[in-house]
């Protein structure tokens, strides 16, 4: 069974509903007040956009409906039409540079043939984390700590990644526990409708907490609640402040209920991390917090500094992973012919040697299915995000002024036969596309889920590719494998694969969709 690009169709009318999922827990008066404030800020932003000039980069702009459409309207439309605007630009220009206009900034989109040229720039000329900080108003959402140093990257690359093979057993133990807490009670043969999106967030949160905080503190309910709330409050606060002129943000931010919640989350996170650090005695703890404490120097050693890094790392590790897993579950239920081959592979590997250190590396089909699902449904439509801090001229003569933001249209590239391997057309979903290619030893490493190159940049590319992608890959393969062994999944009767929601340049699995689940019994073996 194959699926076309309709998998990626967006639900424009649900944009506001998506935001409301985060707002509906607030008191009614607070929600109304937030809407009034956001509307007033948008009016201010409207005036500024109408009167101000745009990017000085001399490359084509895509997305305008006509020469009469004002820039402020194009920026606003990008919120719900970002995917189609980027795709339109890629299909039209493909091997040439173009730009898109979104709320708060213009982004210069570079094609694949420029990637190797720009990725070699030194760190003093370009920053990869700054676009994320800007998108989520880092000065107010406490993201500026990531601009001060790369402590978190050093810890992930030098301590976490080398330990991954030894963490398989630890992660499985926590996942087994998490399933007893987060999956609903089910009788044999009883199908139960579940909110798989929320379940994935909670499962990944618990596994991540075990790796982040160690066995003694990973089930701290205050930390689990804080990390869940922090991501929600950061997203809402950042999204609203993105449309507010910088000069007004100091006055608008304190009025936002989500911002006040965020401050409470930061305070709670600081308290939990501070208590753990003060209670730790000596060295030898094998968790990210301990590694970060040991690797920190100077101001990095401050509890506030470490706590904020831990919160942002939790956000990145939990929610992008949970969304990728939710996409994969939707794809699995939409293409149920993959379920038994994947389950058989897991049973074969585990039956031969148990959950040993190399078990996850032998899940070739599972790895391929996750990579193909991500190809169709990446969380980020644009990757390789950079902001230049020094003017430069590319080989074709294009001048990139200081302060310019660039990105690569990685999702559009992965719908192009020039960048998708195998005989199956890129418009068709082939869950075993990559495992078939990897059967040739020459490509055994190249097409792993966690690997990146200039054709597949879902995790970024080069020295600034996502440092946690190897951990995330293992976490997802482990979670999907255990779910396949213990449960059956299907779409509700009469339902197709849930449509994705595109907000700005992010692709989100529909959080309102449901799947049906039941326990597997011994006779299923």
Curated annotation (Swiss-Prot):
Main location group: membrane
SUPFAM superfamilies: Cytochrome P450
InterPro entries reported in the protein's UniProt record: Cyt_P450, Cyt_P450_E_grp-I, Cyt_P450_sf
Keyword set includes Membrane: yes
Protein residues bound to heme: 466
CDD domains: CYP503A1-like
Requisite cofactors: heme
Record keywords: Heme, Iron, Membrane, Metal-binding, Monooxygenase, NADP, Oxidoreductase, Stress response, Transmembrane, Transmembrane helix
Keyword Zinc: no
Reactions this protein catalyses: ent-kaur-16-ene + 3 reduced [NADPH--hemoprotein reductase] + 3 O2 = ent-kaur-16-en-19-oate + 3 oxidized [NADPH--hemoprotein reductase] + 4 H2O + 4 H(+)
Domain of life per record: Eukaryota
Compartment list: Membrane
Enzyme nomenclature, EC number: 1.14.14.86
Enzyme class: oxidoreductase
PANTHER family: CYTOCHROME P450, CYTOCHROME P450 MONOOXYGENASE AN1598-RELATED
Family recorded in the similarity comment: Belongs to the cytochrome P450 family.
Protein role: Catalyzes three successive oxidations of the 4-methyl group of ent-kaurene giving kaurenoic acid, a key step in gibberellin (GA) biosynthesis.
Protein name, as recorded: Ent-kaurene oxidase
Gene source species: Fusarium fujikuroi (Bakanae and foot rot disease fungus)
């Amino acid at each position: 069974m194959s699926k076309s690009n309709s998998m990626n169709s967006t639900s424009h009318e649900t944009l506001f509903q998506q935001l409301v999922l985060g707002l509906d827990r607030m008191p009614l008066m607070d929600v109304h007040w937030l809407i009034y404030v956001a509307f007033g800020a948008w009016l201010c932003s409207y005036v500024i956009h109408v009167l101000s000039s745009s990017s000085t980069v001399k490359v084509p702009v895509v997305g305008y409906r006509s020469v009469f459409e004002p820039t402020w309207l194009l920026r606003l439309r990008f919120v719900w039409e970002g995917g189609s605007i980027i795709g339109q630009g890629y299909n039209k220009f493909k091997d040439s540079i173009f730009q898109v206009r979104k709320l708060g900034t213009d982004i210069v989109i570079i094609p694949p043939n420029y990637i190797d040229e720009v990725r070699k720039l030194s760190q003093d000329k370009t920053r990869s984390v700054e676009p994320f900080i800007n998108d989520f108003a880092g000065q107010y959402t406490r993201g500026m700590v990531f601009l001060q140093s790369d402590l978190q990257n050093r810890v992930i690359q030098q301590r976490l990644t080398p330990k991954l093979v030894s963490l398989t057993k630890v992660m499985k133990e926590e996942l087994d526990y998490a399933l007893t807490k987060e999956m609903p009670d089910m009788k044999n043969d009883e199908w139960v409708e579940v909110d798989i999106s929320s379940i994935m967030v909670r499962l990944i949160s618990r596994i991540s907490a075990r790796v982040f905080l160690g066995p003694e503190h990973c089930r701290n309910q205050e930390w689990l609640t804080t990390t869940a709330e922090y991501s929600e409050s950061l997203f809402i606060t950042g999204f609203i402040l993105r449309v507010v002129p910088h000069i007004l943000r100091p006055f608008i931010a304190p009025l936002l209920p989500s911002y006040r919640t965020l401050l409470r989350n930061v305070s709670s996170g600081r308290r939990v991390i501070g208590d753990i650090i003060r209670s730790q005695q000596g060295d030898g703890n094998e968790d990210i917090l301990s590694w970060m404490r040991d690797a920190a120097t100077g101001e990095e050693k401050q509890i506030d500094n470490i706590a904020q890094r831990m919160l942002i790392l939790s956000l990145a590790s939990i929610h992008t992973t949970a969304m990728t897993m939710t996409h994969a579950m939707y794809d699995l239920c939409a293409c149920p012919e993959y379920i038994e081959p994947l389950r058989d592979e897991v049973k074969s590997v585990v039956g031969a040697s148990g959950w040993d250190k190399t078990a996850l590396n032998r899940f070739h089909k599972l790895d391929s299915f996750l990579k193909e699902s991500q190809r169709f449904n990446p969380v980020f439509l644009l990757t390789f995000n950079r902001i230049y801090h020094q003017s430069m001229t590319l080989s074709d003569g294009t001048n990139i002024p200081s302060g310019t933001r660039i990105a690569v249209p990685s999702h559009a590239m992965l719908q192009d036969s020039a960048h998708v391997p195998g005989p199956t057309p890129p418009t068709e979903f082939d869950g075993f596309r990559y495992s078939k290619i990897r059967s040739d030893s020459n490509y055994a490493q190249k097409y792993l889920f966690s690997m990146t190159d200039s054709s597949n940049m879902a995790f970024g590319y080069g020295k600034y590719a996502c440092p946690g992608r190897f951990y995330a890959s293992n976490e997802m393969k482990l979670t999907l494998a255990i779910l396949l062994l213990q449960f059956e999944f299907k779409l509700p009767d009469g339902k197709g694969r849930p449509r994705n929601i595109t907000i700005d340049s992010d692709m989100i699995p529909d959080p309102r969709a449901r799947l049906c689940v039941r326990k597997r019994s011994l006779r299923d073996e």
